[in-house]
């Protein structure tokens, strides 16, 4: 789990330019996180979740509950955008469930 932008760059290889231009909560960041964690772990599968669980941090363009989930399987990466409802804990729990569902679908597509 990398909350800080510095950790995203240092451990997952997220580009500083990405964070400066589109922000930490973005499709590009989720993609780079998923690919970076797979690379760092020497794994065929990587998951990156970035979002605004709230409260706080919202902007007119990015509301609380906005989540991007990236899943990378064997170098193929897909990112989904979600606008989730609920309090901070509910948003986090729902994001994890959506991420696991995405992993399952990606594995089925890759291996069947």
Predicted features along the sequence, with ranges:
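Short alpha-helical segments enriched in small residues
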Residues: 1-112
